[in-house]
């Protein structure tokens, strides 16, 4: 006789009184799914009625399955069965946790188990964000719908976006999650770990040896290690991908959706990018509230009802999801829809670096500017696209006194300047060190001189013999309007720490690098070295 994959531990009838008049009756089944190596994955099954069949919402989480009960009850009321599971090595599940490694194997075993259950009607959809979203991507070819929020299918793009190591994201999350429950590590220890050299022993000094963080540091390039975690473009059914302009997964999430669109092209798939981030914002801005930005939970529920149950087809015509690509324009506080990325409606316009640090329409007089980049005093990242506290838009004025930057500004705007896409820079630079980093920071100067970050980006560059070398930089994408009375501010520097690790200017592998060198950076602009910024401008429709 075939051995059953899961064994029922106990079965509960639950009465939840939401209000004095409203009682929700459901059945909670405590079960387990057996995966490779006879490891048992703790699994909760929520059923409206055990004698009927339902479409299934699958949630696999490293953050304790019981924390999803409120959402599970909400979905029960909408006519779903809900399966919530602790990931391998987390909370009630057996085995050892290694970030991202086992999610496809364990997810496939779980889907096979669901399909054998008498309460399953043939449909299984994924739901969730962040790591829970990744567990969907890992098995997206076996799901009838994917509902993923601020997540990534390609983990290399998350840990090494643009080839730069996501120090704060990796350490903030990786140290905390590397335990069966969650590690209560103090913020002081985490902050200290950012400065530790070599980075490969920062985990030992902070808490304990962390296998997956050590492996991340060892594999700086997109090699077979990262390919094994890459599930980009595999979805067969409709996908709702909700991203944030200040989210750590933004760059990857856009590429994830582009890949799905190219391979799959499902008419029900949608990408929404709103003014959101992966943690509490530093500078509060409601951008007009949910009436303007959209209610993410409601959008996901209607998307699932439309694509899994055949209801609410009007979700595809809403102001937030009416196009394949839907972009919230911050400070304009409305959505712009397109059928492509980059949007064909965007025009690229060049602005040259000019004398007196002004952005000009044509190359100005020849100028050279220098600064010293010292890894012992790296340029601080304030807000932006990282995981932690005080993320997203943040006041940048404390950085204005720093000497390790070149700053260029537009004239005061008399009409709106609307950015939608990537701000790129074509620069002529030199460095006293052969291997270094350059960053581009895009910012908004308000009429009261408050400076807010719009977006950032950068990369490692190689400079031979300190000669003027043309490099290309790109910010992460943004959707942002600078309003009349504001100024566009562009900063070129060599750090954004601790969002990214310090480049030590030696070219050593970051796993073992200890030696620190100071670099003298030079930028050239003018007719012979036409350094420029290219803006993706979206003009208002007449």
Q: Residue locations for each model-derived region?
A:
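Glycine/threonine-rich phosphate-binding loop and adjacent beta-strand/alpha-helix elements that clamp
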Residues: 27, 32, 296, 311-542
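Short glycine-enriched nucleophile-adjacent loop
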Residues: 132-142
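Alpha/beta-hydrolase fold nucleophile elbow
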Residues: 119-130
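N-terminal cap/lid segment of alpha/beta-hydrolase-fold proteins
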Residues: 21-50, 409, 413-415
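Active-site-adjacent alpha-helix of alpha/beta-hydrolase-fold enzymes
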Residues: 251-269
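Accessory cap/linker subdomain of secreted extracellular hydrolases
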Residues: 77, 141-234
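Cap/lid segment of the alpha/beta-hydrolase catalytic domain
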Residues: 50-115, 283-288, 402, 440, ...
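Short beta-strand/loop motif that positions the catalytic acidic residue
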Residues: 241-243
